[in-house]
Curated annotation (Swiss-Prot):
It comes from Lampetra fluviatilis (European river lamprey). It is found in: Mitochondrion inner membrane. GO terms for cellular component: mitochondrial inner membrane. Its EC number is 7.1.1.2. This is NADH-ubiquinone oxidoreductase chain 2.
Amino acid sequence: MLSPLIQSTLLMTLGLGTLVTFSSTSWILAWIGLEINTIAIIPLMAKTHHPRSIEATTKYFIAQSAGSATLLVTACLAAWHSGNWAISPSSDPIILNAMTLALMFKLGMAPMHFWLPEVMAGLDLTTGMILATWQKLAPITLLIQIAQDQNNAFILGPALLSVFVGGWGGLNQTQTRKIIAYSSIAHMGWIASMAPFNPTITWVTTLIYCLLTSTTFINLNTLKANKITALTMNKHNQISQMLLLLLLLSLGGLPPLTGFTNKLLASVELANQNLVIYLFMMMMGSLLSLFFYTRMCYLSIILSPPCPTTNLTLWRVTPNKPMALMTMLSINLFILTPQLMAIFIMY
């Protein structure tokens, strides 16, 4: 295990890497920020010294190295072609397509998604939360910047495939971390489909996804639920079980919960772009994700053993105000969608 000082230093380094990518105006600085992120999370992934975590760390390092190498080569070609390192869409479609593929690979989007479920399965829930949320922000920033002049079909195709792969891959899974990994793939599809059209909606959906996923991971960690079967064995923390049910339905995009906001904003934007058939296929793919979320809720609540009044139930739990705030936003933020959009458009 890592000491608190080293762990705090690594977490601050993670934040530094993301901020470097956010504030960079050249490809070389953006690449450095991505590498700082990768180097900082590797000790966090391998801190348990378990063979599964070491295997997951190795797979993650190889996958991210391949994506970073591709991005660096294409950035060098773009700089040679344009004469500067500025982050701007290249006039060469081959270079632009290679950059997009490299960023999709780092995000774990289909068809370059194979590393993400295996890596997530070997991590603890806390590190998995960082991998599924914070590590997505820097690549999404770069993808938004180059997607405006990208061929829409080159982004919309992998986005649709990610929605179907994320829904289909999660059907036969029993580990909660793998289920969240496939959920992440599906959500990345919805987020990427907005990047060529509306950066504001893309960022709103990204932040909502990070909020929902973080809250779900924290709740699963509270219940010590690494597998679906563990959801039926917790007799004493019924409040967390009820909250987990609502969080899972929100992740599935069931109205009127917060997760429906992402589907609604994306649907309106795609309809405005006259992509009705594409939107219909995205909706059909999201039903697969909703199915396995509903299955988890079924196992969590309906199949739980009876809890008579003689059981020692932890109704008087220790107050946790940050967790309460995150859960409330993850469930009830949908009603504040107009105000949220107004704030993002203003700033």
